[in-house]
């Protein structure tokens, strides 16, 4: 790629800066870490790898990067694309072969969404492989919009105030998942992917099928953002600014023991005596 335009340079710097801030804020990567970068062949994971490779060069700490792609044996999957790309970059990589495609097709009725089961099978396989290669962190390409969408999905359909944290210890306790693009918008990532002309691999497992619930939420957020620019960012900031005493979860705040503090200083004026 040739010299970047002013806007392209700003975009690149913004993504690198935001990823660096997220990594610092959540202590995602530490000195000596071996980071397994999970590549799907989509715009998000390509951008994540690109940004992490830059940060690896300029960071004040030393860490390894190992790229990993999971070949799920989908029909027509272009097996050559990622190896060729990673070889050209000179990045250490592994292709994990696991026929989850057949499992999903066997277990999920025709016409039903495959996303949930496919994701669980893929995640379990990658957790196991991360342990095998001694990876201390597992980097996923989820961005700010993914995190906000997941928050609303859980609220609307599961009745839970639960999102997708920038850093997470897996249920097995043996893997730490990080999301370096947590502060980055999908719009910026799409623009960067187009600019870099990454060799995108589409997911053909579900054909044209969409995860309908997620699409409903995505469309809602797009419409909100169109009418009120900055709303998605504001919602994301809210996830970082939680006040348990102002909600209703008894596990997070002790409402039952709440009583008057006899020694408290009055904060409000006695308007009757003014």
Curated annotation (Swiss-Prot):
What's the encoding gene here?
A: ttcA
Question: What does the similarity note say?
Answer: Belongs to the TtcA family.
Q: Which function does this protein serve?
A: Catalyzes the ATP-dependent 2-thiolation of cytidine in position 32 of tRNA, to form 2-thiocytidine (s(2)C32). The sulfur atoms are provided by the cysteine/cysteine desulfurase (IscS) system.
Assembly and partners are described as: Homodimer.
Q: In which pathway does it act?
A: tRNA modification
* Protein's name according to its UniProt entry: tRNA-cytidine(32) 2-sulfurtransferase
The protein's organism comes out as: Pseudomonas putida (strain ATCC 700007 / DSM 6899 / JCM 31910 / BCRC 17059 / LMG 24140 / F1)
Can the keyword Cytoplasm be found in this entry's annotation?
yes
Name the Enzyme Commission number(s) assigned to this protein.
Answer: 2.8.1.-
Q: Which GO terms describe its biological process?
A: tRNA thio-modification
């Amino acid at each position: 790629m040739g010299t970047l335009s002013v806007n392209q340079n700003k975009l690149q710097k913004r993504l690198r800066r935001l990823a660096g801030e997220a990594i610092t804020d959540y202590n995602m990567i530490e000195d000596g870490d071996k980071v397994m970068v999970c590549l799907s062949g989509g715009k998000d994971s390509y951008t994540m790898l690109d940004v992490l490779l830059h940060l690896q060069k300029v960071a004040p700490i030393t860490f390894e990067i190992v790229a990993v792609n999971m070949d799920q044996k989908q029909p027509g999957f272009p097996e050559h694309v990622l190896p060729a790309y990673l070889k050209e970059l000179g990045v250490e990589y592994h292709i994990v072969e696991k026929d989850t495609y057949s499992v999903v097709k066997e277990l999920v009725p025709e016409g039903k969404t495959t996303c949930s089961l496919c994701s669980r099978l893929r995640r379990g396989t990658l957790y196991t492989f991360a342990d095998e290669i001694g990876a201390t962190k597992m980097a996923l390409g989820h961005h700010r919009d993914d995190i906000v969408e997941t928050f609303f999905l859980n609220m609307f359909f599961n009745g839970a105030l639960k999102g997708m944290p920038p850093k997470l210890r897996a249920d097995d306790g043996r893997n730490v998942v990080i999301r370096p693009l947590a502060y980055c918008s999908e719009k910026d990532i799409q623009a960067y992917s187009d600019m870099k002309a990454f060799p995108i691999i589409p997911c053909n497992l579900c054909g044209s099928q969409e995860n309908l619930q997620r699409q409903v939420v995505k469309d809602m957020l797009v419409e909100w953002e169109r009418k009120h620019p900055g709303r998605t960012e504001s919602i994301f900031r809210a996830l970082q600014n939680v006040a348990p005493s102002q909600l209703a979860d008894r596990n997070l705040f002790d409402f039952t023991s709440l009583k008057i503090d006899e020694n408290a200083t009055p904060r409000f004026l006695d308007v009757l005596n003014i």
